[in-house]
Amino acid sequence: MVEDQRRQLMEEEDEERRLILEEQRRRMMRADRDEEEEEEEEEEEEEREEDDGRRSEDEMREDEPPGRRETSHAHIDLNMMRANAHLKEMMDKNRRFVSTRLEEPITQSPPLTNGSNHDNDHDPYLSHRAAHGGSPDLPHSYMKAAHPLIKKEDGIAKMEMDIGLKDEMKMGAGLEDRDGDKPQTEWSFEEQFKQLYELSTDSKRKEFLDDLFSYMQKRGTPVNRIPIMAKQVLDLYELYNLVVAKGGLVEVINKKQWREITKGLNLPASITSAAFTLRTQYMKYLYPYECEKKGLSSPSELQSAIDGNRREGRRPSYHSPHMHPRGPSLAYHHGLDLHTPSGSPPPTMIPHPSRIPTLPPRLSPSTSPIEDDHPVPLGFPRQGTLSHAAMLAELAERGSIPPPSKRSLLAEEHHHRLLQLQQQHLVMPTAHLKVSSARAHPENGMPLFEMRGDNSLVMSIELNSVLYQGVLYPRGGTRSSLDRDTSTPV
């Protein structure tokens, strides 16, 4: 988006420059035509005067004696010579004036830095930019603008457009004066980017900036304007030193050290998109120089770092249910892992995860406890085709456990279905619970697992030597609250 705006701004400036040059060309051609018309009128008037003078002289000559007639001819010839000399002098002055006016845009100095606007009175475009608060510096594309020149044909000054990049307009080249005899004083990078050179008194600043601008010019991407950030000049020297000290641009991007770079440059903390702006400015002005001088990274590594930073920026939060695998369903016959998406207890009698110790998972049927001698293999599918009751029936057929009663199968099926519904909304594993299914606690005789006639389920869970008991109601039933008693530690 920023590059498109810059490109659009450059195109608008190019169009403005072209229109100004075209208007200047039309004005000069109009002035040239007016001068030609004036000269033609003067010549015609002089010819008429000469004709009138000849006719009057002929008339007078007829009346004059022969000796005086020769004297008159000599006087007329002398006057004609004086008139021709005066006319030639006037025409030479006009040609020199037009040539001077048209050659002035060519002999301008190279683009100046912000705040420097001397010699702008010669170029109407630079004067217009400086008068409206703009920078008189021109982009590199203006070096290929049309330059008006003078061509003499039959004593008349005519103007034509020479399209192309002139040698005298190249950056760093000496410019010839109007006479074409002596080259003007060559300008330096320090004169063009004076503000960058005066940011500090570091002795290595001038050496670095000269080397940087010279390298960028040799590689065909000259620096033609001073980078601005937060309404102040961006110190390329300090920016380069800070980034190189941290291992180069790729290292800064990967480790997200732009905040330290911003502080090192004394930029305001409230600036928006500081990391993106500094990265783009560094890539434009300094990264080729870093690769050439330091070789800390390659363009392919830089692109990989940028792509990785973009992917990380699009990564969802850690609490998103799509970033973590769902908790496994009943993977063991004796175990169950319960977990919640944000650390809050599930809708059963499970306390906060921070208070739940890690216990070995164990789940037993409601009629008779199943010993640890018959575990289900770990590779049991998360959503198998057999229900939990069917799995128990299969184990009973093998002789591992006695066949459960119909009522216990219904209770176990209901309990298993309830746990599966809970697992559909769980994300992070929190604790392993020990769910007992015996009819009564071995010590106090309290019922631990019982299916009641109103489709409710009485459960008791032993957690950290604390016995929790409550009544579970089916989802969508008339009662949604949970009655829970906490007994004393066993």
Swiss-Prot record:
Residues 1-33, 51-76 have a biased composition (Basic and acidic residues). Residues 316-325 have a biased composition (Basic residues). Gene3D superfamilies: ARID DNA-binding domain. It comes from the Eukaryota. Residues 202-294 form the ARID domain. Residues 34-50 have a biased composition (Acidic residues). GO terms for molecular function: DNA binding. Residues 106-117 have a biased composition (Polar residues). Keywords: Developmental protein, DNA-binding, Nucleus, Transcription, Transcription regulation. Residues 389-479 form the REKLES domain. Residues 1-77, 106-135, 298-369 are annotated as: Disordered. The keyword Nucleus applies. Pfam families: ARID. Disulfide bonds: none annotated. It is found in: Nucleus. GO terms for biological process: regulation of transcription by RNA polymerase II. One of its GO terms (cellular component) is nucleus. SMART domains: ARID, BRIGHT. Transcription factor involved in skeletogenesis and oral ectoderm patterning. This is Protein dead ringer homolog.
